[in-house]
Amino acid sequence: MISTDDEQRAFDALIDADARIEPRDWMPDDYRKSLIRQMSQHAHSEIIGMQPEGNWITRAPSLQRKAILMAKVQDEAGHGLYLYSATQTLGITRDEMTEQLIEGRAKYSSIFNYPTPTWADMGAIGWLVDGAAIVNQVPLCRCSYGPYARAMVRICKEESFHQRQGFEILLTLMQGTDAQKQMAQDAVDRWYWPSLMMFGPPDDESPNSARSMAWKIKRFSNDELRQRFVGMLVPQAEVLGVTLPDPNLTWNDETQQYDMSPIDWDEFMEVLKGRGPMNAVRIQTRRDAHEDGAWVREAAAEYARKQQQKEQAA
């Protein structure tokens, strides 16, 4: 019989060799719990993230814009489903995760608790929020847990389309009237700082980051990813003609990275604790959708039961 110590050594050897941990492999309980926390939060974020953009489907300025936005929101639904399925391989059920979300016990990305008052917000979300997601998620394609890593490959490909869509919306607005240019700039001003917060608190204040990196769930720290994101944004902002709302954003030759103003982490914590502008609305909307869709789940379950009966009788 293999002892727990032997299993731990085998697990550590796989991590050290940059190999993949699969669902049937032995894994420490803390590793499993850490993955459930991160992956379920990621799945919840994709599902809740449909709401800010879904609000604009009926108000998009053209049929083409509407079709593209619908496709994007459908992608987000698919991402959530991939991730829920991947998380289920760790021993938690879809119902448990959904219950945690609609009861307000589960966390999701704080960025989706901000309102989207103008069409330009669709551009800012695509460029900034999806851009931050790409920087955060591409390294997850090399995550040590196989189902998560494989799900991320497809998700990242689709996120790159979302980021380009947002960039193109802002570019079109910046080539328009003065009012359209101002609308685009205002949206960038609204979403810039929340998008930087998406990477999580500073490394010295992040309770989970170091352990996730040791297990190779994460490959880079929060601050490293944030710096990488800012370095990507600066030249893109120049192409767009928008100004990033940080007067202290300057290149540092010595550190070879950008110096920036301090982030308002008090705002981040307030939103994370459920006191953001749209927290209550987002959860209530998700709860309503879940309750309204109960008949669909019941019908699907009954159909599956009858099909199973037919197969057994055949």
Language model: regions and residue ranges:
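Conserved alpha-helical segments that form or flank metal/cofactor-binding pockets of metalloenzymes
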Residues: 1-10, 72-100, 167-170
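Extreme N-terminal leader/anchor segments
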Residues: 1-31, 56, 292-314
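Acidic/His metal-coordination segments adjacent to aromatic residues that form catalytic metal sites
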Residues: 20-40, 100-126, 143, 176-180, ...
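Helix-loop segments that flank and shape redox-cofactor active sites
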Residues: 25-31, 49-71, 133-148
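Alpha-helical scaffold segments that form or flank carboxylate-/histidine-based iron centers
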Residues: 31-42, 60-79, 122, 147-159, ...
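Internal, conserved structured core segments that host functional sites
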Residues: 114-165
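Glycine- and acidic-residue-rich phosphate-binding/metal-coordinating active-site segment common to enzymes
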Residues: 143-194
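Extended, helix-rich structural scaffolds rather than catalytic motifs
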Residues: 182-314
